[in-house]
Amino acid sequence: MKNRNMGLLIFLIPIGVAVNFVGGQIAVLLKLPLFLDTIGTFTIGAIAGPFAGILVGLLTCLSISITNPQSLFYVINFMLMGLLAGYLAKKGFFTTVPKTIGAGAIMGLIVGISGSLISYFLFNGFGVSGTGVLGGILMGSGVPVWASAFISNMSVDIIDKVPTALVAYLIIRNIPQKTFVKLPNGNVFLNAYKK
Amino acid sequence: MSYIELKNVSYRYPLAETDALKNINYAFEEGKLYGIIGENGGGKTTFCDLIKGLIPSFYGGDLTGEVFIKGKEIREWESSALASTIGYIFQNPFTQISGIKETVFEEIALGLENLGVEREEIIDRVTSVVRQLKIEHLIKNNPNKLSGGQRQRVAFASIIAMETDILVIDEPTSQLDPKGTSDIFEIIHLLKEQGKTILLVEHKIDLIAEYADEVLVIKQGELITNGKTSDVFSNVNLLNEGVNIPQIALLSNDMKEQGKPFDTFAITRSQAREQILKKGSEKICH
Amino acid sequence: MMDETFINSYRSPQLSKNWLLNLNPLNKINIYIALGLITLFFQHWQVNVVITLVFILLAVAAGRFKSFISPFLKLGLVIGPFFFIVRAIFWPGENMIFNYGIINITQEGIDLGIQYATIMLVVCGILVLCTVTIKAEDLTYSLEKIGVPHNISFMILSSLQLIIDLKDKTNVIMDSQRSRGIETEGNVFVRIKAFVPVLSPLFLGAISGAEEKTIAMDARAFSSANPNTHLRFLRPTPALEKILVILVDILILGLIILGVVL
Ligand SMILES: Nc1ncnc2c1ncn2[C@@H]1O[C@H](COP(=O)(O)OP(=O)(O)OP(=O)(O)O)[C@@H](O)[C@H]1O
Ligand SMILES: [Mg+2]
């Protein structure tokens, strides 16, 4: 008989999407100075692998665009995060706090670079949210456009993605073993927690 | 040939240190309602998952022995063929609703759509299930906005629409109030009358006494007792095995110990009433 | 009482009285995006405004003006001015109009700002128009008709429902945390500490629910290899509609070529 765990992935992906929304919403309700709106992508990507992560990112981007049309142009970024979470988790990055911080920083860096490129080529270097104002202030102070785009996007991404990765880590630590055995990246976590 | 047969079945979950099912042998017959009881963590749900074909395909782990459904080994069944042979309903009303349909009518139709049934037949089958379960008033509602009891009835309807011969039902009422519970048992009664083969896990022991033809008692993964419902419950020692026994069965037992046994060992209220009325009238005649 | 009219409604395609709403969802998207693409080739803000007006007219034609205009204005009035202002006051240009500290208003900045602000109006128009003229289940139906697997439909529809469900649960948990005296106000660190206890039960609960849902949907033949059928269905696209869409596409292509040549 066919393996049914493919089914489980199909049901986890929408959860990742919804958690991205809810995380962002709670961050707003608690007036946190962070977005925390990619926790679902990080977590599901980490436990269910790059492919699931990419889908979470894609679907999140599409549904968030309804209320936040600018996001649509950053769809690559949304998917990149899922891909990276899945890949880094496979390499054991989400198994300890220091490694998780490392994963967050790497992801913030890469996503920051790709975000700046998008902002640079599509939006004259201005990010589409607070980063746009930050970039603008830099430009206004005489910093070249490309540098403003990079500095504003990267700093914001790294500041946001490290805590996001940590929250994902806390969630993953509390996922029961019986769930891990059914997940693509599950073995990584089972082996890590055994020790 | 038995309908469902287990031969020397043992099963261990991945990473577990002991077997969740230990060397189980049993043959189920067509058209009967089997009550499965036993203490918490005994392995009842595992047993149901096994028959539903989820072990080992979904859970992984080590399965030894053989499970035959209608003569075919469980590992050889296609999952969609199994879905149209065995229906499965469990306790949580919230996870059994798909969450992708806008009306209860469409929700009940989902399984038939997946099987590729033609539209007219879907409409007929859904309509007839809706009638049987008396949920006409719900068909236009959004399934995601129903109460727990309503959702559980829709879950039953969705499975019944698939017209499976076998139904595995695991604690269907543990999250429902008394009204919800009696609605569900009305449905189970109906299914039994239609000649379905039913495996029912239920902690409300009086309901098992009333509905089950046979009872299986599972403790720590072993099938420790089985037999006709009245025979199983006439053995009061079961109390020591962490199994509840219907109050009426205890009463019958008390009568026996008092030297005034009922003619037949009563386990439900109506049986007891019959016996008591009979005894009463005998006295009057004397 | 069984509602026979309701049941009969599944026997015929889902249709409304409005011709625009009755277009195949993919054709709608095709038309909206084709219109939107014009902006990229003309680079005149006036063109962008005209296209925005066309979207508003389409909303009127669909009988959805009311549901369109409020989200459109809410989005447009935030995003448009935002795109304008950051460019107008920060973009480094030659023709200085006003300069004070980091504020640096130039003619180039203003032109760029107007250009981008109006493009974003068009983007908002497309998205809002999609949400008010296309039902998610109709979209997934037509995607399946062109060969997208129904797993993808499930993921899309399920995501939309779960967003609603989890948001509701969030509010419940936030309230109960507050009433249990867990601080959700106070300084940043207090608030950060409140984040995980709110999110984590939601998330973990949903994950364990996903396992049960897998089992429940398995019992509903979810993994069946048979091609699935559809109870609820849309009409096959009429020839006239196909011609209309092709004409619109050709017309727009023509306009775009014109724009490039000009
Ligand atoms: N997915 C799983 N992975 C590992 N062990 C499991 C899993 N599910 C159940 N078990 C273990 O298997 C044993 C049998 O559990 P099972 O759920 O079948 O019992 P049950 O009789 O249904 O209990 P209850 O009355 O509480 O529903 C228990 O020891 C349980 O901890
Ligand atoms: Mg159980």
Protein language model features and the residues they cover:
Chain A
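Interfacial aromatic-anchored transmembrane helix boundaries in multi-pass membrane proteins
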Residues: 21-36, 58-96, 129
